[in-house]
Amino acid sequence: MWIKELELKHYRNYDHLLASFSSGLNVFIGNNAQGKTNFLEAIYFLSLTRSHRTRADKELIHFDHSTVSLTGKIQRISGTVDLEINLSDKGRVTKINALKQAKLSDYIGTMMVVLFAPEDLQLVKGAPSLRRKFIDIDLGQIKPVYLFELSHYNHVLKQRNSYLKSAQQIDAAFLAVLDEQLASYGARVMEHRIDFINALEKEANTHHQAISNGLESLSLSYQSSVVFDKKTSIYQQFLHQLEKNHQKDFFRKNTSVGPHRDDLAFYINGMNANFASQGQHRSLILSLKMAEVSLMKALTGDNPILLLDDVMSELDNTRQTKLLETVIKENVQTFITTTSLDHLSQLPEGIRIFHVTKGTVQVDSDIH
């Protein structure tokens, strides 16, 4: 899939923008604070209905206005699709082909994106919540049912935690009802995650071995707070541990086990990647990003759109070459932001270059 056209009205520092793109590489050049990252954020938002930079939708609205409109014309294997998101003080409206979507799980996945931004380099050593978010964003695009089950899990989790905080003593019967619901949704969330990580590991290891010239292997491990064994279902084990932890959870006023506590670990040649070098971290994240692209295509039959936000300068020539070889080979539409072409020595011919200045975008008259 690829974005043929994007229109922004009152988004960040863009009062109005209408642009069309190459199905291959699109490079956005400009000084800092001109709107390059805002532009990629808009594509990300149109795909996932959320920003990767802020939780406050009001920050996305141009200072002179009270509403935001984003529309995109997306070419998929199955045909052209029009996406639209409107924001106002009344909330958010999402549309596919002018039809309002009642549920996010009906909208997300229509246009898949993979974002590679400087903050992704913190994925290995950052908080577990970053790694859970990484899993959730990918899985939500690949399997819309995952978002449905995760949303229901979080709703029941909020109810259970609220009860634990307010209760003066344990009502075993009431807690049993919440436990059953939490275990039911939570088990399916964990099953989806485990399957996803197993598939991602194979793709990531292939890319990592290519980047390291066969010197390093990359493995991933889903770290669950629920203790598993092969004889009993995840649901039964999760439910048992929830019941076992009633007193502890009541004392701590929160739920101590479940997918909201889970994590993801990375290993290079069997060693925890927390102890890897900076260069190895860059190779690991690059391998993951390329694996995301490969896996989305393998599981859905269509390519995602790749957003590279000021990260090419973080990669040496070898890593740049591996990345660009992948996107060209797989025919992935790619958006790159940069302050200069000087460090992009590996860019091929046939790219479209845009210049970004104070919320305006001008395309070069020629395709380079």
From Swiss-Prot:
BP-aspect Gene Ontology terms: DNA replication; DNA synthesis involved in DNA repair; double-strand break repair; SOS response
Coiled coil regions in record: none
NCBIfam families membership: recf
Top-level taxon of the source organism: Bacteria
Chief localisation class: cytoplasm
Cystine bridges: none
CDD domains according to UniProt: ABC_RecF (cd03242)
Name of encoding gene: recF
GO molecular function: ATP binding; single-stranded DNA binding
UniProt-recorded name of the protein: DNA replication and repair protein RecF
